[in-house]
Amino acid sequence: MPDTPPPTVAGDAPLHPDTQMVGHGHDPFLAQGAVKMPVYHSSTFVFRSAEEGAAFFDVAAGRAPAPAGASGLVYARFNHPNLQLVEARLALLDGAEAAVVTSSGMAAISTALFASLRPGEQIVHSSPLYGGTETLIRQALADWGVGATAFDDGLSAEAMRAALETAAARGRVVLVLDGLNQL
């Protein structure tokens, strides 16, 4: 996706957010003239040479820094044009710098927590939690050296404050979930 911000005006008239969402992130001239983004069914993408492919894989694997403004596609499980478009439009919708789409809520929670926490740190979380999230925190993160402090009453400022004070020295993440599975 281009790094240029989406247009927010047409002439002097501000564009409605719906208009921005419909058109942002797709250049028909880069898609054989298709007015709307085609659905890409390819799982792999071509490089101009084996050397270009090898260099890109080195960047993707973290063995080499990415050149400024460089982007490319390797494998659809990493990224593909449709995913890039959805992420760009979600970022636009939320007024964010970027967005990440995952295949499940647990993938999103796991990615966010492992990216944000380090061994020796603490997570403060609401309780009860969805079972998968509870297992992630109580087992996987605990095995990784991350502690957890829960607060049982998400409506009580005092309960939340007490949990935050308990974890203050090592606290790094506050996780609040609502809408548990229906029993």
Question: In which residue ranges do the predicted regions lie?
Answer:
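Conserved N-terminal alpha-helix of the aminotransferase class I/II PLP-enzyme fold
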Residues: T44, S49-A107, G132-Q139
